[in-house]
Amino acid sequence: LLDPGDTPHENARFLVFCAAVIRAVSVNAKMLRAIVASAGNDHRLGANEAPPAIISIFLGDQLSDVFEQIARSGEATSSKESGTLTIGVDTIPAMPKHSGDRNRTSPFAFTGNKFEFRAVASNQSIASPLTLLSTIVAESLDYVATELEAAEGDFNSAVQALLKEIVTEHGTVIFNGDGYSDAWHKEAEFDRGLPNLKTTFDALPALVSEDAVELFTKYNVLTEREVESRYEVY
């Protein structure tokens, strides 16, 4: 489902699922930050080879270009070539270069056929982050399915229209640059409106927000009391 293939602009299924993840991260960025919050992780995020506390998505040049085409014209008509990698040894042929990158400054990165959530602390159980990720992606896929099932007319046109809507509304969460730079922190917070919750104290209230309680109870993941109890424990 998250394998773009050689021509991702033609892979509607991939684009729909990728867009659903983009929407999920954009809508629930505060909760994603909160679910990895701890005193130790506050010191780690943004330094020492760790991503910043600002939740953004790295897609790589190829996929970013595809979604930019969709945002501009409503559909993508081409995909950038991945290119080749040469290492300067004549006896070794050029190797195909992966279209994704290893941008270690991104907290949520696409790496070929999957997304990596890199903000989780090294000594933290992955249970809560996985529970949240599964829930927010399920909600986003629910939204996508509801929109497409209600669409009238040509189905492919409805898919393209939905992709454009998601990218236009949530594309601000996509960032392929240096997450450590001061310029990005200013751009993210002031130009893009992305949350920058630097401390656990700032982040944790997102777990008991009205949106969080509604999300977990709607999909029968946690009751309101269970949500509140986890907040108190954290």
How would you describe each model-predicted region?
Residues 2-38:
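Catalytic or ion-translocation cores adjacent to nucleophile or general acid/base/metal-coordination motifs
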Residues 24-234:
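Acidic, glycine-enriched catalytic cores built around paired aspartates
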